[in-house]
Every structure is written in C-alpha cells, then in structure tokens.
UniProtKB/Swiss-Prot annotation:
Protein name: Proline--tRNA ligase
Biological role: Catalyzes the attachment of proline to tRNA(Pro) in a two-step reaction: proline is first activated by ATP to form Pro-AMP and then transferred to the acceptor end of tRNA(Pro). As ProRS can inadvertently accommodate and process non-cognate amino acids such as alanine and cysteine, to avoid such errors it has two additional distinct editing activities against alanine. One activity is designated as 'pretransfer' editing and involves the tRNA(Pro)-independent hydrolysis of activated Ala-AMP.
Domain characteristics, as noted in the entry: Consists of three domains: the N-terminal catalytic domain, the editing domain and the C-terminal anticodon-binding domain.
Native organism taxonomy: Bacteria, Pseudomonadati, Chlamydiota, Chlamydiia, Chlamydiales
Source domain of life: Bacteria
Gene behind this protein: proS
Organism: Chlamydia trachomatis serovar A (strain ATCC VR-571B / DSM 19440 / HAR-13)
SUPFAM superfamilies membership: Class II aaRS ABD-related (SSF52954), Class II aaRS and biotin synthetases (SSF55681), YbaK/ProRS associated domain (SSF55826)
Length: 581
C-alpha cells in the first residue's frame, strides 16, 4: 500500500477527552475516529489490525473444534425473561431497549447466552452431537454510564464469544480446559504480559470463572498475585495480618462522640489503632424484584468486598446503602451504626471474631461504646469472609505466601455455567434409559478492542504505537527523502518486490522530508523501517531499523532473504488492498 492512496491522517494532538495513552495514540495515528461519546469508527488502518487479530482468534478456535456462527444483535425480551436476566439487566440501566411495531420489547445484544441456548435446544438431536463449541466475532452493546478510555469502555464494542454444550460436568471441564489453552495461545501470539486469575462470575453465572488480565498501569482491575496463583481482588481469598487482643474483658463505657463519624476520626479521638475499632456498614441487596438491607461488621483497618457479601447472602447484586436509605431503615445517621440492637440482620467478618474490648457505634447519634465484646455485650453473629484482599495479605492457595498487587485490564473471561441456562431452555438429550438429561454449558469471551487497547498501553513508547508483528497493519515501511528521484525509483522497485511476496510493505511516497516520514512511521507503530538514505548511493546498502531502535544494513539482493527470516507473510490471510493506476 502507498501512503498517497491510504485514507488516513496523523495529527499532533488528540481529542481533549483522550485521557489514556491508547485512546490518544489511536487518534493521533489515524486509527480511530470518534463518532459520538463511546462510539467509534475504525479507519482502514485499524480495520487491518482488527482483521489480523480476529484471524488469530479464528485459527486457534478452529483448531480445537470451534464452529463459527453469527447470532442476532437484536434480541427479544422473552428470551431474557426465561432466565430472569431481563429485570436484572434493566435494573442496572445498561441495556439498549426498544420496541418493534408490534410493541414487543427488544434489546441490542450485550451477550448471547439466551439466544444460543434457544438455538441449540431446537437443533440438538442426540448425545452423539456433544460436545458442541459455537463461537462468533461480532458487535456488542452496553449503555455505559460513563464511557471513557476509548476502546476500554465503549458503548459499542467488538467481541469474540464462545459457547460450549457438554453431556456431563466432566466433559464441560474438558471444554473449559481447551478454551483456556486456546485463549492462552491467542495472547501468547501477541507477546503480551498477562495473568489468568480466579474471578467472580457476576450476573453471567456462579460457576468456575477466570479472567485474563493484561498487566499495565492503566488497568481498572486490581489483581492479587502470589507465585503462580492469581485472583481478581473481588474473588481473592486472603489471610490478613492478625492481632493479639486483651484477654481481660473490661466493663462497657458509653462515650459522647459529637460528629465523630469516620474510622480516622475515631482513631484520633480514642487514641487507638484502627484494628481495635469495629466498623459497621449497611448494604442493599437485590434478588429479582426484592430489595433487602443488611449490616456487615468488619475490622476498622480493612475494606469491605461487596462481591463476597453478595455471594454469602446469595443475592444477585449488592451495594452500599445511601445515607437516606440508612436513615429510613435504621433511624440513625451514617457513622453511628453498630451491631447492638441493630434492626436489620447483622453479619461479621471472620477477622472480627477474636476482637475484644473493641470500640463501636451503638445506633445512637454522637455516641460510641468502648470495651464491647461478642457474646457478652452483643449477640454472636454469623461470620463470613467479607474482606477485600490487600498487598501483604497471605494467600491460602500458595502456602501462605504474601500477595503482590498489580493493575490489569481484563481482556477475556471464561465461565462454567453448569445447567443455569440449559434448564431455562430445556437444552438436553435422552440418555440410554430414555431419560432427559440437561446439557452442561460454558461461556467464554475476548474483548477484541480492549485487547488491542491493552496491547498499546503495555507496549507503546514516547514515539507512538508499537504493534506486535502478529497484528501490525503493515510489516515494514519503505522510506526515502521526498524529491529524491533515484531514491523514489529504488523504493518503488523494492515495494513491488516485497508486495508480490506478501510481506505487506507500506511505501511512503509523499513528497516530505525523510525525518518527517520516520516520525510518522514510529507513530503508526510499524515494526520495521526500510530506509533509502544518503549512504545508499555510495554503499549500495539499505538501512533497516526496528521499532525498538536496532539497526542493520542489507543489500537489495538480500532483502527478500532478510524479510523471510524476520517478517510474517500475510498473503493468504489479508487480501492486498487494490491500488489505483
């Protein structure tokens, strides 16, 4: 391809909203055009990257028996109502909902578990067809409250989603292992630093679940890693530091604490460490159409993990109650809530069990109690694990070694769903006794745009993008000084030779200075530059410079040999762009 024919442009400045590196560089380098907030157009440059990324995905999924399908973007509400997810998703206000001319409710697809379950239920004829692995690569929609970070959190995005159907839990596990390995190979081919971590299934399902995270400072997710084990902070089991508490139980004292509401204020007021203060938080839960409130007690030096609370209470969703809700249901202001005489069900974290003579609120404004004790002063509650893991906490899955904390961008998620969806749609087969058995289902997804954005966050430098060879739009840029007719003739000859062999060169034939072209090539992230400089006339050697700065010289006669050793050949994967005469 010649730059004079390529529909693109570079710019010195990105959109003011480009708050992260990937978004900024994709705009500056001419890969992405903002159509509206959270909605983007892919330019010819980026579409080439997308095609190569999706080709890698197809190769790896086809290799394990995946069959590609195309499922509808427009989905009827009645399918979602069968699984109970219609109201759950509506409550979060993340669905794009519309009605057709017959007044039937529809949504734009955020995922396809319901649709694919209905499809397989109608077409599955017998056990001999199992396991089934269907996948697609297509657009998804999510009405983000705050779309930001470009492709990281968009309203419309490209995803690969796979669905497996098996005849038993064992076969489901086999399919899970195959998809897990295929996803690893996909990310390995991009040369990304990533971790696979245990995760919570959220609204998709409560079975076995893992996330793939690309490590980078931008990452919205906090990852706990200890040795070879990793977990999303929401799912990480951790052993926090323990403390020795008094064995001599002291008499309770009520203390006036005017407007002392926070743990930090209490720490100063009582001159006592946070781990001797009991913190009581009120959470609001949702289960289908019902809302309930619970009190959760944790140590004052720790933070609550709402995902763990929701799992413990077996509810769909959980969030901290607002000040207005607390006042309405507990008749006391936030900051003065305690477990004693609490009017709502109360639970406590395991780390609070050994606490003695602790400080806590007692549901009276401007009053706290000293020397409170479980059993003596407060009825012993049910205990659970409600803590958010922190750096230095010990990892029970790694022999008690400490956790390190990293930031990561979630680029893929894999789930075992069991029979949650197949039961709703009666997806099953007859066993040898003639009895109906349900299929066991798995669901898996890769965020294509997020993966490429994470790739940029991890690999880019102060010059611009740095694409892995596997997905770069062009493998090598051919550069010469504008106005150099001899250099132009040589460049054209080399370009035609490389193009014929499928090495995907980009010929910068603009009438610009060589220095300008070099900077543009770096901004675009092309892995190699083939430079026809001043020294070529005297030495007859071409200069090749990698995106990372390594240089070598090669003669025109040996160029194809060098390319065959260092560049991928995409002749069969990406059709060459048609050029005008």
């Amino acid at each position: 391809m010649r730059t004079s024919l390529l529909f693109y442009r570079t710019s010195k400045n990105a959109n003011k909203e480009a708050s992260v590196l990937s978004y900024e560089l994709l705009q500056k380098a001419g890969y992405l055009f903002k159509t509206s907030k959270g909605i983007y157009s892919y330019t010819p440059l980026f579409q080439r990257v997308i095609l190569k990324m999706t080709e890698i995905i197809r190769e790896e999924l086809n290799a394990i028996g995946g069959q590609e399908v195309c499922l509808p973007l427009l989905q009827p509400a009645e399918l979602w109502e069968k699984t109970g997810r219609w109201k759950a998703f509506l409550s979060e206000k993340l669905l794009y909902v519309l009605k057709d001319r017959e007044n039937k409710a529809m949504c734009l697809a955020p995922t396809h578990e319901e649709v694919v379950s209905e499809f397989v239920a109608q077409w599955l004829t017998g056990r001999e067809q199992l396991p089934i692995h269907l996948y697609q690569i297509g657009t998804k929609f999510r009405d983000e409250i705050r779309p930001r970070f470009g492709l990281m959190r968009a309203k419309e995005f490209l995803m690969e989603d796979s669905y497996t159907f098996s005849d038993s839990p064992e076969q489901m596990e086999e399919q899970y292992a195959k998809l897990r390995l295929a996803y690893q190979r996909i990310f390995d081919r991009l040369n990304l630093k990533y971790v696979i971590v245990a995760a919570d299934g959220g609204k998709i399902g409560k079975g076995k679940s893992e996330e793939f995270h690309v490590l980078c400072s931008l990452g919205e997710d906090t990852i706990c890693v200890s040795g070879s084990y990793g977990a999303n902070v929401e799912a990480a089991q951790a052993i926090p530091p323990s403390y020795v508490y008094d064995s001599n139980l002291l008499p309770v004292e009520e203390v006036a604490t005017p407007n002392i509401r926070t743990i930090e204020d209490l720490e100063v007021f009582f001159n006592t460490p946070k781990h001797k203060i009991l913190k009581t938080l009120v959470v609001k839960t949702r289960q289908k159409d019902s809302e309930k409130f619970f009190a959760i007690c944790i140590r004052g030096d720790r933070q609550i993990n709402l995902t763990k609370v929701a799992s413990f209470l077996q509810v769909d969703d959980c969030e901290l109650a607002s000040e207005e809700e607390i006042l309405k249901h507990l008749h006391v202001e936030k900051g003065f809530i305690g477990p004693l005489y609490c009017p709502i069900p109360c639970y406590a974290d395991e780390t609070t069990r050994p606490m003695t003579n602790f400080i806590c609120a007692n549901n009276q404004k401007d009053v706290h109690c000293k020397h409170m004790n479980w059993g003596r002063d407060i009825p012993l509650p049910a205990f659970g694990d409600f803590l958010l893991a922190e750096a230095g906490d010990l990892c029970p899955q790694n022999g008690g070694a400490p956790y390190e904390i990293f930031q990561g961008v979630e680029v893929a998620h894999i789930f075992n769903l069991g029979t949650r969806y197949t039961e709703s749609f009666s997806v099953g087969f007859q066993d040898k006794n003639g009895d109906k058995q349900l299929c066991w289902m798995g669901t898996y997804g890769i965020g294509v745009g997020r993966t490429l954005a994470a790739c940029i966050e991890q690999l880019a430098d102060n010059k611009g993008l740095v694409w892995p060879l596997a997905v770069t739009p062009f493998s090598i840029t051919i550069l010469y000084n504008g106005g150099d007719t001899e250099g132009e003739a040589t460049a054209l000859q080399l370009y035609q030779s490389l193009n014929t062999e499928g090495f995907e060169p980009l010929l910068d034939d603009r009438n610009e200075r060589l220095g300008f072209k070099l900077k543009d090539s770096d901004l675009l992230g092309i892995p190699y530059k083939l430079i026809i400089g001043k020294s070529f006339q005297s030495t007859g050697l071409l200069e090749i410079e990698s995106r990372s700065g390594e240089k070598c010289n090669v003669s025109p006669e040996n160029l194809l040999d060098w390319c065959s050793k260092n560049l991928p050949c995409h002749t069969r994967k990406i059709p060459p762009l048609q050029e005008q005469n």
